[in-house]
């Protein structure tokens, strides 16, 4: 990908490498007995921004500062609004999904991952992006309405392509668990719960509008850039709103070290929802002893 970005190879060569590595990945997933297959997000520069860059109204450029992770700045493009949000034509992730779907069989289903609506909202409502966002929108409500419409249209496209398993990746809740999380969201500690409800609300508007036979789950973590993290804190601070009120079918929750706290907040998860515990870390090469 770096060679492509530097102009040393063309898109066809990049896509050939992507196709080959994704095919190899899916083969390994099947060999190991996994019933859900993905493309490993191998076609993306970042796990979340590529989705946004494909939309009308979103601009980006190389960053001069990065985002402050623990011990390292995450060097990802500055991403901001330059116009009203709209999905014109087919989103490129839909074709990415089609490539994986061809490998489905009686034992496997293809899953698509995207940043959650809350993650999208956070990107453009963080303090450093407020000026550009409200240069395009007269109110937060109008912006949120367009976010919901863009997601609804994307999900329609994805569903029509045969997707029945969608995962919303969401680091906003991990940031809410941080002691200084309120600063990131431009509020006070006392105002954090209302902000959480706003982010939960935009997620639920999109989830509730999805087709009934589309399984929608969410993955929550505290950031991962070169195995560093952006926040720390237990799920207690978000248990009521996220675990108790978000309308997903299942939660995939990071629990791979002491930064995640204990399991007590899981008591807030309704009985009709599933929880998958992320106990095995991807951040260190050492294998767990049990």
Where are these regions (language model features)?
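Domain-level signal for soluble alpha/beta catalytic cores
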Residues: 1-290
